[in-house]
Amino acid sequence: PTPEELGDGIYRIYYSGRNNNNQSHISWVDVDLNKPYQVIKYSDGPVLAPGALGCFDDNGVTPSCVINLGNGEKALYFIGWNPGSTVRMHLFGGLAISTDNGKTFSRFSRAPIIERCSTDPYLNTAPWVVKIEDGFHMYYVSGHEWKNKDLPRYNIKMAHSKDGKNWERDGHVCIDFKDDSENALARPYVIFEDKLWKMWFAYKSQKYRIGYAESIDGIDWIRQDELAGIDVGNTGFDDDMIEYAAVVRYNDQHFMFYNGNNYGVDGIGLAVEK
């Protein structure tokens, strides 16, 4: 789930659903946090479909971040899925732009905005972008290695941009593995609050859990997973795994959208700060 604030407690939640060919498309629902269990509007259909055959996103697209640029323009950063041969899949970050306040989106480029490079030779995906005074920061998932065809290891790194489209990377790691058993650090979600940068992310040894980190400068981070504020449920759709958290603050209360068992097969969960 990728939320966008619309005002008065209404949030647009971008999500990916799969078709009969198991290809993900991006759609959205509007929810009112004053009535958090009520969906008030659905998109008429997907706002972004898989790319052309042979492109980095020809087998699916998943939303990662939405930024309102003003004057009716929005930037949708997304994950592009492409099946592999020697490895199970390739994942790269893309960008789509809306000039009609989010009614429709068009790709900025048919190529990824974060492709392979000398510091990131494997997958580069799940971009979360924040606007800063002199440009943009991106927190993204970077492949560290493939243990075998079906098991990649990936951590969270950082990139910088003046325009939000062209990115510079130096390999700086923001969130690294706790130990050798940890193989996945996924979906960074970053906010600035109370003079601190705060990040929620997913981490996995056997089953996904939601982690948390803080930073003074947005560059160097300290993991404090015990402060994530949530664990698996006792029963139900999230009793085995939880992942892909997105946290918003409304009326001095935090709301967390997240996925549960089997990567969200039952839909999107909502947790409310006590």
Language-model segments: residues:
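Beta-rich carbohydrate-recognition and catalytic domains
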Residues: 1-59, 67-122, 130-186, 191-240, ...
